[in-house]
Regions:
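A short beta-loop-alpha structural element at the N-terminal edge
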Residues: 1-15
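Conserved GNAT-fold acetyl-CoA-binding loop/helix
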Residues: 15-44, 54
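A short helix-loop-beta-strand connector motif used in the catalytic cores of GNAT acetyltransferases and
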Residues: 42-58, 75
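Conserved beta-strand in the GNAT
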Residues: 58, 64-80
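Conserved acetyl-CoA pyrophosphate-binding loop and the N-cap/start of the following alpha-helix
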Residues: 59, 85, 89-97
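Conserved acyl-CoA
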Residues: 93-109
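C-terminal "cap" of GNAT-fold acetyltransferases
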Residues: 108-122, 126-131, 135-161
Length: 161
């Protein structure tokens, strides 16, 4: 089931993001060199859940958050799935719900950033129709990897049935 996040879930969402990030980014941010900033991430999720300009969606698995996605006008700000649920369609369901909600709000396209060396995520998004848009940026925290910009045109993307 996909639903909007609740403020009382901020800690669970921060822990979910930590688990997914450590599993996905250990080759970019080795945890022994770059400890995960759990307190900062917790504060950001608490703020995001209460922000009326953001939508935070939770994919519930057995009554607990198995995945989370945050979006705002024309942006998918983050999509995280617990590693034990990778490859089972949970990320796709969250992704599709985010795009459907943006379509309903009239967004003609959606953008996101993906770490250049996150090959799994890049394959995921490219397989769903996202294309590199030519934008790059340096991530503002060490070791300062590169983010690659992606865009998907929503008017040409079928909504979830």
């Amino acid at each position: 089931m996909i639903r909007e996040a609740r403020l009382d879930e901020a800690e669970a969402l921060a822990e979910l993001q930590r688990d997914a990030s450590v599993a996905a980014f250990a080759h970019i941010f080795p945890p022994e060199r770059y400890p995960y900033p759990l307190d900062e991430v917790l504060a950001r999720w608490a703020e995001a859940v209460e922000n009326p300009n953001l939508t935070v969606l939770v994919a519930e698995v057995a009554g607990t958050p198995g995945g989370v996605a945050g979006c705002r006008a024309e942006w998918l700000d983050g999509l995280y799935v617990r590693p034990e649920h990778w490859g089972h369609g949970l990320g796709r369901k969250l992704h599709d719900e985010v795009l459907d909600r943006l379509r309903v709000k009239g967004s003609p396209r959606c953008h996101l950033w993906v770490l250049e060396d996150n090959e799994r995520a890049r394959r995921f998004y490219e397989g769903l129709g996202w294309r590199e848009n030519g934008d790059t940026r340096v991530v503002p925290f060490p070791p300062n990897p590169i983010d690659v910009g992606y865009t998907i045109e929503l008017e040409t993307t079928l909504a979830t049935p």
